[in-house]
Structure formats: structure tokens, C-alpha cells
Amino acid sequence: MATTKSFLILFFMILATTSSTCAKLEEMVTVLSIDGGGIKGIIPAIILEFLEGQLQEVDNNKDARLADYFDVIGGTSTGGLLTAMITTPNENNRPFAAAKDIVPFYFEHGPHIFNYSGSIFGPRYDGKYLMQVLQEKLGETRVHQALTEVAISSFDIKTNKPVIFTKSNLAKSPELDAKMSDICYSTAAAPTYFPPHYFATNTSNGDKYEFNLVDGAVATVADPALLSVSVATRRAEEDPAFASIRSLNYKQLLLLSLGTGTNSEFDKTHTAQETAKWGALQWMLVIQQMTEAASSYMTDYYLSTVFQDLHSQNNYLRVQENALTGTTTKADDASEANMELLVQVGENLLKKPVSKDNPETYEEALKRFAKLLSDRKKFRANKASY
């Protein structure tokens, strides 16, 4: 009798634990964030291809796509382009690009996008080919048609304010329902590299609304992870599915943040003695790189600290290569040789440990993430069927 009683107690304890785990998975909000970095977008593209392949394997579904698993996908600059590629619908209302299509896209179009215009005084590239290929690939698709919530940043140089394109903002600000092609060019229009982008939409009253936009990195400084999280948090006010992360309850947040690599040579290149003699011109050449590196580091530090304090460190994964050298550090070197090197960087990164304190490789961590994403999707699907 005692044995039977003990077995029943153990059974109900397991059942309660399982139910609790299921509830957490069901309520979990999933976020994917992709950094900016020009042609270095090849690195996160390799990571996305691996992750999507794992999701297809886990769910035994070759048609599985990243947009099926993430509640919010955000990006800036080249990360904004990747966001659009994996969330913009085709004629069958499925993502027009699989993750495996992204690297070939860079190889086909990168050399034409980063084709020096020959201008000494203007931007390095005229942006015409970039706009042409965006219009060709994304067509007339607008923000509201994205297959999941998106968060793509830009900066308006006329109003001096950041502009964040998301589906959740459209009810209050319908003028933000811009074409994805305009948004992608705008978030990639880095000052000195591409010309700023002008376009117009209509307000709810039918009035003309003008945009004068440059690179989203000006607004979010390359790493859009916090922006993507804030969009997910704001959605909690309107969508019951997001209620679990209200008041920044990161325990129910599953965040994957992909970097485009940092320059290991940068810190070694300059010393205090050397820079003490610098003037405005020398500082202008490196200040943006310094600011982006510092901001990206602080974003990762903040998120890591928050998740660790909540004992939810496995819910956050930052995938970043911190040892880029030579031509791979350049955002606009679209030579075939350099792109091949970037592919190698991405593939080698999968085999590297997540950190000095965590021997788990990125490949292993992404497999774990894929299982969580798959389980959570199944739990939600089962709930919806009742």
C-alpha cells in the first residue's frame, strides 16, 4: 500500500512538473536578432542556414522556415535585409527565401552592390543596383504582410529621430506600412557608403508622409537585440500570446542574437600614445567602429547579466566571432575570395565554444535552441487545436 501511495505521489509530481514545463514552453516568446555589417552578413547567414536545417530535421519537415518559429525577427543594415528575406511572403504566402538561399544571394549580388561609383566627394556606392535588386526580390510587399512580427530600424535625418518599422506600430502609425524594398534600402544606407533614401507613404487621413532615412545602425548601433526585445515586450500590451514577458519577465523569453563579427586587430592597432596626437580626421575614421564595438559589447553584457540573474542563461544565445582579421573585417569587400573566407568564418564559428566558461559549441547550442523552438511550436499548435 505504501509503495502504491509513493508511486502515485511520484506520478503526480512528474505530471505536475511536465505540465509546468509545457506551460512555460507554450508561453515562451521567441526572438531572433541579426546585426548589421554589410557583406559580413554572410556569417549570420551561415548560422541561420544551420538552424533552419536543424528545425527541418527535428520536425521532419523540409518546408519548415525560420518565420514559423520566431514571434519577432529584427535586424539592422544587412540584418534588416536578412529579416526581410526570411519574412517576406511569396505567392504561396511562405517566405520567399529559405535560409540556404541567403549566402548565394550575397555571392550573386554583393559584387554589384559594392561596386565603387568612382565619386570622390559623394558616397562610395551609388545604391542603384541595391535598390533595383530589392525591388525585384521584395516587389510591392509592405510591412503588414510580413509572416511574423518584424523590427527593422532606420534613422530619419530630417526629424533627427529613429524610425522602427514593425507590424504592431501600424494601428497607431499607418504611415509606417512602407514597402519592404524601401525599408531594406533605408536600413542599409550607411553614411559615406550609400546615399540616404527618400520615399513617402500616406497617413490615416490620406496626407503625404515623407521619410529621409539612413542606416539603422545610426539608431540602434549595429546590434538590434534590445530593440527586438522591446518590440516583443510592447506586443505584450496588445497580444495575449506575449503576456508572459510583461514587465520584462525575461524568464519566458527565448532570444537568439547573431553578430557579423568583430575585428580582433582593432584594439591592437592604436595606443594612447599614438592617439594623443590625433586630430578630427583621424578620429573620424575610427570613432564609428569604436562606438559600434562598445555598444554591441554592452548590449550583450546587459542581456547576459539579466538572463543569468533570472537563472535563465540558456534562454539567451549570442553567436559572435570576435577574431576577424584582414579583409574579413571590411563591410564592403565583396570579392569572391573574401566572401569565401567569410563562409569559412561562419562554418568554423559553429565548431567554437560559446564562451571560455561554457565549452558547449555554437553548433550544440543551436541544436538545443532548435529543439526548444520545435517543442514550443508544437505546444502552441496543440493548444490551438482544442
Swiss-Prot record:
Residues linked to a glycan: 115, 202
EC top class named in words: hydrolase
Tissues in which the protein is found: Tuber.
InterPro entries linked to this entry: Acyl_Trfase/lysoPLipase, PNPLA_dom
Signal peptide start-end: 1-23
Keyword Lipid metabolism attributed: yes
Active site per database record: 77, 215
Positions of short motif GXGXXG: 36-41
Positions of short motif GXSXG: 75-79
One GO location term (cellular component): vacuole
Residue intervals of the PNPLA domain: 32-229
Gene Ontology process terms (BP): defense response; lipid catabolic process
Record localization: Vacuole
Keyword Signal listed: yes
One GO molecular-function entry: nutrient reservoir activity
Motif (DGA/G): 215-217
Swiss-Prot/TrEMBL domain comment: The nitrogen atoms of the two glycine residues in the GGXR motif define the oxyanion hole, and stabilize the oxyanion that forms during the nucleophilic attack by the catalytic serine during substrate cleavage.
Additional notes on this entry: Patatin have a dual role as a somatic storage protein and as an enzyme involved in host resistance.
PANTHER family found in the cross-reference section: PATATIN GROUP D-2, XYLOSE ISOMERASE
Role summary: Probable lipolytic acyl hydrolase (LAH), an activity which is thought to be involved in the response of tubers to pathogens.
UniProt-recorded name of the protein: Patatin-07
Lineage: Eukaryota, Viridiplantae, Streptophyta, Embryophyta, Tracheophyta
